[in-house]
Design a protein with these regions (language model features):
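Beta-propeller-forming repeat regions
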Residues: 1-416
């Protein structure tokens, strides 16, 4: 029998300056090694100590050092300061948009502002040409993913009060992208919380999930039809939402934070009642430690991802605390440790499940985006974070240990 494997994480902080709420990675200089993009910078891998500008980093703030003295600090005011501010850079999505073989990056700005992509100039000593492609990207969890099933990702978001997606012109992706509305205009706004993609009803087509239900993708998208809405409450408005068969019964369930600025993480079990799709709520974590089987509690889950962290074939929940979402005041437990956790999914034969929480880190947290992927190419998913504490990579390590060592590292249930 093979020795059990212990999963640990090593934090590397690339910067303590606040430039963005979302960072990502790709090989930007084509040297075969992944680099990090965070705000106006990209950091050369594998060391990430040498950085280059995508665009001019002009933001600064004045930090008082006493009654008569201030110092100018680069970046937006975050953990290095005292007041709450916001960056102009919330999500980063690398992709080769113009097909020249060099990775570019799509940047979604502050909610309600424009989305642009920066064209890789193929040399590290130049700013990247900026292409504004969509004028107003609403929702606090927009994404860039293949919603339509055509093999090409779309910008999925809200604009002008409706859900939909924007597509580039393949012959000229620098031109303004085309908007395809999928919902009626219902007053959705730039600060609407909670959105995700997934095949809810198992018809092979990707649906759009939001806090009040899900929009069913029709068989044909010709003519931009309005999608069918199925009302189901999925919390008050979290962050990224996911459709996944949690308990292995063949039906996709929904995983979401209950609210991005307070407490709560849940999965909604899909079941059928006379052929009708219904959901049953299972709270994984909430405002009281007793509401988690292992006594874990933290707030501000403003980014939630679903990734197989331990290679067992089941997707696990990866999330954390968005440090100072609204600054020093406002959100509950706002000054608690900026933790990251992964919740290991364990399926039982009777279709019951457990999500075992493992702390990844206690001094980084998440932004509005959390990117989980194999940065150092060792076969294990790492975490990339940009937020008010700075820019981080949390490197995933795994080593065989004795049964006693493994058992000592396991979380202990405090309730049934």
């Amino acid at each position: 029998m093979a020795d059990p494997v212990l999963h640990t994480f090593k934090r590397q902080q690339l910067s303590d300056q606040f430039w963005c709420e979302g960072a990502s990675f790709a090989d930007f200089n084509r040297d075969g090694v992944n680099d990090i993009v965070s705000g106006p910078w990209w950091y050369e891998g594998p060391g990430f100590t040498h950085r280059h500008e995508l665009y001019a980093p002009t933001a600064t703030f004045a930090l008082p050092l006493g009654p008569m003295t201030t110092v100018t600090v680069p970046g937006f005011e975050g953990a290095l300061g005292n007041k709450n501010t916001y960056s102009d850079n919330f999500f980063a999505f690398p992709r080769d948009f113009n097909g020249d073989g060099w990775m570019d990056v799509l940047i979604v700005g502050f909610p309600g502002k424009e989305t642009v992509w920066f064209e890789n100039p193929k040399t590290p000593d130049r700013h990247w040409p900026r292409h504004e492609v969509f004028p107003q990207t609403d929702n606090e969890s927009p994404t860039f993913a293949d919603l339509t099933g055509d093999g090409t990702p779309e910008l999925v978001c809200i604009t002008e009060g409706a859900y939909g997606y924007a597509t580039p012109d393949p012959s000229d992706p620098a031109k303004p992208w085309t908007w395809h509305r999928i919902s009626p205009v219902k007053g959705y706004g730039n600060f609407t919380h909670g959105m995700g993609l997934g095949d809810v009803n198992g018809d092979g087509r990707t649906d759009l999930i939001e806090k009040d239900g899900w929009w069913e993708q029709p068989a044909s998208l010709a003519g931009d039809p309005v999608w069918t809405f199925h009302a189901t409450p999925f919390g008050l408005g979290g962050s990224q939402m996911h459709a996944y068969d949690v308990n292995g019964d063949g039906l996709n369930d929904v995983i979401t934070a209950l609210t991005a600025h307070a407490f709560g993480l849940a999965w909604y079990e899909q079941y059928r009642d006379g052929g009708e799709i219904k959901f049953r709520e299972h709270i994984l974590m909430n405002k009281e430690p007793s509401e988690n089987r292992y006594g874990v509690k933290f707030s501000e889950l403003h980014a939630v991802e679903l990734v197989d962290m331990d290679g067992d074939g089941l997707k696990d929940i990866v999330t954390g605390k968005r440090f100072w979402s609204h600054g020093r005041v406002g959100d509950p437990d706002r000054n608690q440790a900026a933790v990251n956790y992964w919740f290991r999914l364990v399926r039982e034969p009777d279709h019951s499940v457990d999500f075992i929480p493992y702390r990844i880190d206690d001094n980084s947290g998440v932004g509005t985006q959390l990117v989980v992927g194999d940065v150092d190419r060792n076969g294990l998913p790492d975490l990339v974070v940009g937020n008010k504490k700075g820019t981080f990579v949390l490197f995933h390590e795994a080593k065989p240990v004795s049964q006693a060592e493994w058992q000592k590292a396991q979380p202990t249930p405090v309730s049934k």
